[in-house]
Amino acid sequence: MNGTVISKAAAHWNSYQLADILTHCFEGYLVSFTIDGETFATRFAAEDISLNDSRIWMQDGEPKALAIITRRGQTSRLAAFAIRPELRGLGFGKQFMQQLIDEARARGDRNMWLEVIVGNDSGLALYERMGFVRQQTLVGFHATSSTLFTETGDMLEIDPLVMARKMMTDSRLRLPWLSAAETLYKLPGKAFVLNDVAYAMIATNPQFTRLRMLYVDPAARGKGQAKKLITLLHERFPGLSTATAIPEQMAPLYLSCGYRQDPVTQYEMLLKL
């Protein structure tokens, strides 16, 4: 196998094919990764995938690498990047990343984000060589126990779009892409509000229930509203977990509410274009 490697826009494939390619390219990765077509479509649509900017690299007619690019305004993000084992360690990672960066600059993007699993030393080294700089560490949590939920009427269900719009009015809020308001309201799930000041977004699917975001009005912070809401959610949704998208500085809140931090963590990284 020594054919030329060529790239094509991911728009040539459907979500089910892209899910298979992504799973195939992640073979032997640090953390086991699989995804089906339905989940691929739901997840990356919420993250604002750009199929025309996402790339598949082919060799001898077979997909060998895949980069998922998501975009909002003049900001893009490398949402997933995987290379088949037979092409790893041959310099293709740097070649493919340079192509993605050049294309981002050509379309006028100002910033490019990504996340990398802590412990993926080769991936981290590659991104740092390409100019990406660590911004923060992202962590995840899961509930370790729960008590009987008693309906008191304090926690009310609302339209997720209402919560997203509330977050968008906070000009000082800077969240990871996965927790941003623009992502949250597009996911299947529910939103809740406590005392008209504390909000939570719960994403649901047949496999798990996940707390995707907790938000408290700036004027109500430091008064225990977040802790009360997260405790109520813990009771109502046994086994509740979060995505690995929580800024590390929020860990004390979750740990104090009966959650355990997951072993997998990520660095959020930024390249200014």
Please annotate each region the language model reported.
Residues 4-20, 152-167:
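A short beta-loop-alpha structural element at the N-terminal edge
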Residues 130-203:
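Amide-forming acyltransferase catalytic core, primarily the GNAT-like/NAT-type
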Residues 56, 62-70, 77-82, 193-215:
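Conserved beta-strand in the GNAT
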Residues 30-68, 167-193:
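Active-site rim helix/loop that mediates acceptor-substrate recognition in acyltransferases
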Residues 90, 94, 106, 118-136, ...:
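Conserved active-site alpha-helix within GNAT-family acetyltransferase domains
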Residues 83, 89-102, 125-129, 222-235:
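Conserved acetyl-CoA-binding loop-helix of GNAT-fold acetyltransferases
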Residues 110, 117-119, 139-163, 246-247, ...:
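C-terminal "cap" of GNAT-fold acetyltransferases
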Residues 104-115, 235-247:
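Conserved GNAT acetyl-CoA-binding A-motif
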